[in-house]
């Protein structure tokens, strides 16, 4: 496929720019995806208003097409593909690792320390464009039951949380506390339940998020943070606290409560 497309870049200074790019051609082990949905992450908001604060492996390469939560349909195949083909609906995992190091081979591409590691939307072109070039190894098949928007929302937030919960081995033996019920915190509760947690507890400042966690059945108990919150949790767990705690609040008080 040849031609031009418009893509969004994030130069900071409360600005998003649209620039013209060539539609990329997939090479070995690559596919061209027509973007059907590409959601916005908190890191995108930060980059728009305060520029990307990451350095080194997390640094933003100026002029890179933004969007690390893309989902779409494969419209063109490169060579030597093993699992995917034209017409497949796919989610793009937001980190493209080397595929060879220990972390990559364990499925933890986000922890890849190779110089080849690149995040879509930060160091390589992402999904805020009509088409995105992706490595086949970075793709996850999107089930028919899920929409493209579902897939885009899963790409980063759920993927990051899933790795964390897998590493701490959440199971039916565990009561799980999640502090901070934004999108990532809510995803944490949902995945913890799916992994068998016998009790899920959420702590959140905003009332609407507390209500959402309860109405969706994600948390067995939800509390607002105050001087009594720790005692409430101890009372629920027979005085010994929870087996696993995840802080999604980015707040010192939240981290302290989780610990």
PLM segments and residue spans:
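Short, well-ordered coil/turn residues at beta-beta hairpins
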Residues: 93, 246-248
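Conserved amphipathic alpha-helix within the SDR
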Residues: 229-239
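Short SAM/SAH-binding signature in class I
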Residues: 240-246
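Rossmann-fold NAD(P) dinucleotide-binding segment
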Residues: 252-259
């Amino acid at each position: 496929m040849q031609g031009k497309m418009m893509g969004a870049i994030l130069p900071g200074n409360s600005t998003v720019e649209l620039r013209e790019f060539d539609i990329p051609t997939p090479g070995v082990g690559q596919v061209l995806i027509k973007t059907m949905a590409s959601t916005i992450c908190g890191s995108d908001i930060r980059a728009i208003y305060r520029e990307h604060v990451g350095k080194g492996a997390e640094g933003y390469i100026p002029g890179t097409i933004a969007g690390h939560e893309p989902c779409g349909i494969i419209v063109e195949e490169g060579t030597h593909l093993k699992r995917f083909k034209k017409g497949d609906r796919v989610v793009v995992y937001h980190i493209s690792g080397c595929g060879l190091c220990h972390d990559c081979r364990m499925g933890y591409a986000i922890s890849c320390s190779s110089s080849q590691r690149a995040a879509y939307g930060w160091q390589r072109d992402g999904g805020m464009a009509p088409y995105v070039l992706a490595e086949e190894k970075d793709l996850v098949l999107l089930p028919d039951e899920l929409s493209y928007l579902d897939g885009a929302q899963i790409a980063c937030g759920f993927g990051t949380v899933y790795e964390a919960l897998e590493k701490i081995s959440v199971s039916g033996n565990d009561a799980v506390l999640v502090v901070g019920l934004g999108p990532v915190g809510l995803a944490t509760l949902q995945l913890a339940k799916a992994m068998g947690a016998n009790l899920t507890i959420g702590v959140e400042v905003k009332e609407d998020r507390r209500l959402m966690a309860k109405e969706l059945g994600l948390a067995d108990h939800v509390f607002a943070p105050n001087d009594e919150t720790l005692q409430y949790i101890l009372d629920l767990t027979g005085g010994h606290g929870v087996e696993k705690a995840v802080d999604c609040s980015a707040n010192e008080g939240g981290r302290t409560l989780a610990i």
